[in-house]
Amino acid sequence: MSKTIAINAGSSSLKWQLYEMPEEKVVAKGIIERIGLKDSISTVKFDDKKDEQILDIVDHTQAVKILLEDLTKHGIIKDFNEITGVGHRVVAGGEYFKESALVDDKVVEQVEELSALAPLHNPAAAAGIRAFREILPDITSVCVFDTAFHTTMQPHTYLYPIPQKYYTDYKVRKYGAHGTSHQYVAQEAAKQLGRPLEELKLITAHVGNGVSITANYHGQSIDTSMGFTPLAGPMMGTRSGDIDPAIIPYLVANDPELEDAAAVVNMLNKQSGLLGVSGTSSDMRDIEAGLQSKDPNAVLAYNVFIDRIKKFIGQYLAVLNGADAIIFTAGMGENAPLMRQDVIAGLSWFGIELDPEKNVFGYFGDITKPDSKVKVLVIPTDEELMIARDVERLKAK
């Protein structure tokens, strides 16, 4: 029985899921956190069991070794030969990659070259790819790009209104992100609605620590909220989302703590969003607790968050000339009914009627009333499964 492992590498983490394919059965999953520190944590979940170790893991190569040792130690695999494919989530594929790609030296170099488009993600992905190639050089290795799904956008959508030389010479344009998630939930929505995806107009809202909204026309991305980098779009957990770009030189000139544009961008990526406005947390659960206690900063952060998401959904309702369904997914999208309620409350003009009971009780699927003109669905995303499927598809070529 062949097994495929889906990898999502962060700068100090390695999240993984092992599948039996083509059955798509999850055999085990886990995460290695705090890579590079002396109290790294390796967690493995399998057969309703959970094993956790505190280790000294210096880099991603050692993390991969620990992961593989854990799989054999717990009898999840007998030997490494059972693993016939590995798929790596890569956030930025730029214009190099319109679909998933088999890994070779050139692909790894291109992933690293594109780090400017996803500085929080691509370097870590490259480290994970190199680690697996070093330890398991003979298995099929595939890169699955968050940006690939959005390559169907047209020039009038992906180009910025700046001199064309910045696109032709430097490839400055909208690329989007979370494409694997948007593609998965759109496919699942079509199944739940009982209609071909090629007939549907959908708005998919990936609302986690990162937030992106996509307009999906007949199965293709025609617009999305993230841009040249994943910093663009609505307000997020620690990211600002869209701001007036003139703010950047203004802050460099006036705040001595922000010495250059890179420092401002770092602040916009890591210290802004819910965290920046609330002053306390990037976690919606903490923000909602602040609503209950009437913390004015939490209330403000929440209201800005709702406002920004609502505006993007309204924008894409116009772009699509209406929609058959709006889909919420990812951490907050799946688990924050108050957020869903307040976003949809501002869209009632479009004939959307939420069912309060279905929404509040964590109902996955349609959470609208039967006569709602636009359906609202809650669909758990499964990027790891999409990655595993692409590995199998490319193995078969």
From Swiss-Prot:
<comment type="function">
    <text>Catalyzes the formation of acetyl phosphate from acetate and ATP. Can also catalyze the reverse reaction.</text>
</comment>
<dbReference type="InterPro" id="IPR000890">
    <property type="entry name" value="Aliphatic_acid_kin_short-chain"/>
</dbReference>
<feature type="binding site">
    <location>
        <position position="8"/>
    </location>
    <ligand>
        <name>Mg(2+)</name>
    </ligand>
</feature>
<feature type="binding site">
    <location>
        <begin position="283"/>
        <end position="285"/>
    </location>
    <ligand>
        <name>ATP</name>
    </ligand>
</feature>
<feature type="binding site">
    <location>
        <position position="383"/>
    </location>
    <ligand>
        <name>Mg(2+)</name>
    </ligand>
</feature>
<feature type="site" description="Transition state stabilizer">
    <location>
        <position position="178"/>
    </location>
</feature>
<dbReference type="Pfam" id="PF00871">
    <property type="entry name" value="Acetate_kinase"/>
</dbReference>
<feature type="site" description="Transition state stabilizer">
    <location>
        <position position="239"/>
    </location>
</feature>
<dbReference type="GO" id="GO:0000287">
    <property type="term" value="F:magnesium ion binding"/>
</dbReference>
<keyword id="KW-0460">Magnesium</keyword>
<protein>
    <recommendedName>
        <fullName>Acetate kinase</fullName>
        <ecNumber>2.7.2.1</ecNumber>
    </recommendedName>
</protein>
<feature type="binding site">
    <location>
        <begin position="206"/>
        <end position="210"/>
    </location>
    <ligand>
        <name>ATP</name>
    </ligand>
</feature>
<dbReference type="GO" id="GO:0005737">
    <property type="term" value="C:cytoplasm"/>
</dbReference>
<dbReference type="GO" id="GO:0005524">
    <property type="term" value="F:ATP binding"/>
</dbReference>
<keyword id="KW-0547">Nucleotide-binding</keyword>
<comment type="pathway">
    <text>Metabolic intermediate biosynthesis; acetyl-CoA biosynthesis; acetyl-CoA from acetate: step 1/2.</text>
</comment>
<keyword id="KW-0418">Kinase</keyword>
<keyword id="KW-0963">Cytoplasm</keyword>
<keyword id="KW-0808">Transferase</keyword>
<dbReference type="GO" id="GO:0008776">
    <property type="term" value="F:acetate kinase activity"/>
</dbReference>
<comment type="similarity">
    <text>Belongs to the acetokinase family.</text>
</comment>
<dbReference type="InterPro" id="IPR043129">
    <property type="entry name" value="ATPase_NBD"/>
</dbReference>
<dbReference type="InterPro" id="IPR023865">
    <property type="entry name" value="Aliphatic_acid_kinase_CS"/>
</dbReference>
<dbReference type="InterPro" id="IPR004372">
    <property type="entry name" value="Ac/propionate_kinase"/>
</dbReference>
<keyword id="KW-0479">Metal-binding</keyword>
<feature type="binding site">
    <location>
        <begin position="331"/>
        <end position="335"/>
    </location>
    <ligand>
        <name>ATP</name>
    </ligand>
</feature>
<feature type="binding site">
    <location>
        <position position="89"/>
    </location>
    <ligand>
        <name>substrate</name>
    </ligand>
</feature>
<dbReference type="GO" id="GO:0006083">
    <property type="term" value="P:acetate metabolic process"/>
</dbReference>
<comment type="subunit">
    <text>Homodimer.</text>
</comment>
<feature type="active site" description="Proton donor/acceptor">
    <location>
        <position position="146"/>
    </location>
</feature>
<dbReference type="GO" id="GO:0006085">
    <property type="term" value="P:acetyl-CoA biosynthetic process"/>
</dbReference>
<keyword id="KW-0067">ATP-binding</keyword>
<feature type="binding site">
    <location>
        <position position="15"/>
    </location>
    <ligand>
        <name>ATP</name>
    </ligand>
</feature>
